[in-house]
């Protein structure tokens, strides 16, 4: 009988024991994933590790006062959640725009947007959780000459006009 009343799913031979929920311990993340100079990525969820079909998830660490090279992630959408530290994001064809995010903040990066992550702290590692809209990591490193002074951009919530900025 269908679990949700609408779709029937074949019960796997193990009754979901090993093919259902997966818990990936933080000390078993895979650093053998696409990298960008200036940061360390580690995969938790992808096709090879858990059979994910539509997402990739992992962690990103950027050392104090360090920055990544400019890059984009092809057709993928990315969500970055700041666990600790302060992120300064630059984006655009010449990295001409800038915004900052801190613990508890989310960052959305649309497909093909050239961007750069910067640890805005000189003494704290920037630690983030990263989720992408495909099961494999796609990173296209770019050779961009950034503008000297990027333009600050504040986000305006299109739904809750008096809410977040």
Task: Annotate each PLM feature.
Residues 57-60, 79, 108, 123-141:
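A short hydrophobic beta-strand segment most commonly corresponding to one strand
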Residues 62-65, 91, 101-121, 131-133:
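Conserved metal-binding segment of the jelly-roll/cupin
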Residues 67, 76-103, 113:
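A short beta-strand-loop-beta hairpin characteristic of the jelly-roll/cupin
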Residues 49-50, 75, 94, 122-123:
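Short strand-connecting beta-turns/loops that link adjacent beta-strands
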Residues 96, 122-124, 143-146:
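Short, glycine/charged-enriched secondary-structure capping and boundary segments
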Residues 1-54, 69, 139-165:
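A short, N-terminal "cap"/entry segment at the start of jelly-roll beta-barrel domains
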Residues 49-53, 63-67, 84-88, 137:
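Short, charged/polar surface micro-motifs in flexible loops or helix N-caps
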